[in-house]
Amino acid sequence: MRRRPRTSALVRNQRGATLVEFGFVAFPLCLVIMGIGDLAYQSYLNAVTKGVLDRAARAASVGTLNATQIDSFISNQMSTVMSKQATVSVVKTSYYNFSRIGKPEKILTDTAPLGSYNSGDCFEDANGNGTYDTSSGSAGLGGADDIVYYQVNVSMPRLFPMAKLLGWPATQTATSSVILRNQPWANQAAPAKVCS
């Protein structure tokens, strides 16, 4: 006669219970750890981008770096904290004064219809290209005493492969901008008056 195994012995057996409990907790725990790591790296990338841009802009405002050197400086400094697939773009726009940032070139003599540029109007050619522009800025570092707007965009793949799981984009970006006035190492060139 064969004895039947006692099921009560299996019910009382506690060996391996921790492994089963850890199995329930492991996946959410890994997600939380990777999520915190991803958010922490994003904050770190933003802080480094801001610091590098501030240093480059300060050096450019006193004439230490030219436009090409700024791009190289920022790329070299950022290469230590970003992946090989990352892209860095630097935008430099100069303005004659603070009040002209983001505004069209100033109309000096306005003919009908008033309030908008049309043929026969005279305007202050702030960017020196000889045509009326809806943005008075010009690309580059400008000259002495000019206002320069710097913007850096860094885009790279995320460190952890969990972006799709949480609905995040597969790439992370860091953007930083700063506005500085160049030092007055010479007289500021006044914008020309152009009439059409």
Regions found by a protein language model. Give the residues of each.
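Alpha-helical assembly-interface signal, strongest on the long, hydrophobic N-terminal helix that forms
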Residues: 1-78
